[in-house]
Amino acid sequence: MSLSLLTEPPRPPAFRVPWDELQTFEWVRALEPCPQDPIHHAEGNVWIHTRMVLETLVAMPAWRALSSDDQAAVWLACLLHDVAKPFTTKEEPDGRITAKGHSRAGEMLARRLLWELDAPFSLREMVSGLIRHHQIPFYLIERDDAQKLAAEISLVCRADLLALVAEADIRGRVCQDMQRIVDNIELFRAFCAEEGCYDKPRAFPSDHTRVVYFRSEGRSPDVPIHDDTRSEMIMMCGLPGAGKDTAIRERFADLPVVSLDELRHELEVEPDENQGAVVQAGKERVREHLRRGERFVYNATNLNRQRRGPLLSLAADYGARVRIVYVEAPRSTLLAGNRARAARVPEAVIRRMSERWEVPSLLEAHALDIVLR
């Protein structure tokens, strides 16, 4: 399938949406038989809604005024914003139709689909962030944690582009509360502008202030927090075969390494077997380095927030700074690299891992290095 069909949005003067061409994608065809709740989507199924959203978007003066790169990001986010609904939609006991979790699931599905099509990293990650947060402008202004949520959004996408996605989403449907939601989106725009994070990341007094702010409650993002860290954990992150070992040799050859691959070998555990014992052994070795206040590398896939979370919490408990080094390669390069590994991971396992893949962000660590192979 052609990536250009997705990344080159409709152009003037006609701004024609290529509906027939888009239907060549299996995930587009899957939208049509997916029902929606008539209260929020009286227009019908997900494909009808998606078509209405895209037609609304390309007619919006604010979208037409964007740079070509920003147009492509918003266009693609609108096309993919409900891509996970076919997998998350169900009928509740009371007869209502829900799609709980479709935003987060859509982020991960879009990331995998675009990676397989060799989409540029920056475009793909902007689109993924917009999809994950596409409903937040509907209600952010009503949340007690609006300040923190706005700051979080600004570190993974852009609030100004997100507002356009949300506006196209709500105007591209038939519902009773459209005007209330449109008003909330305008309030979202104003709030993010007041917070200084409408078209740029939220600024913090220091990296440590940022990390502690997102890990705790009741703090101001503007009040500096004393940096009392005494060591550093360097957390590698990336799919098998992406080149994490190479990155360690190039950047951290003089540091001790806790490697889950080596622990699998020691414990004689295959990659497609239960990894509980390997993960626990790795955690204990990490704890030993933290107790000694050392700088060290933790080398594992660490592919989503759930996997990274316990180690990041452990590092925080021991007063360690965290640098995440995320390594990525094109799909063809990655699979070739995996085949060349001594400890080859079955490709079916890599596929399953890519379905739960969340690229790290500065919400999680003091520093983030992106290494693209």
Predicted regions and their residues:
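N-terminal pre-Walker A segment at the start of P-loop NTPase domains
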Residues: A193-D228
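Divalent metal-dependent catalytic cores for phosphoryl transfer on phosphate-bearing substrates
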Residues: V58-N184
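Conserved phosphate-donor/acceptor-positioning beta-strand/loop module used by diverse small-molecule
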Residues: Y318-G337
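Glycine-rich phosphate-binding P-loop
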Residues: E232-F252
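Pre-Walker A (Motif I) flank of P-loop NTPase domains
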Residues: P224, D228-I234, R292-E294
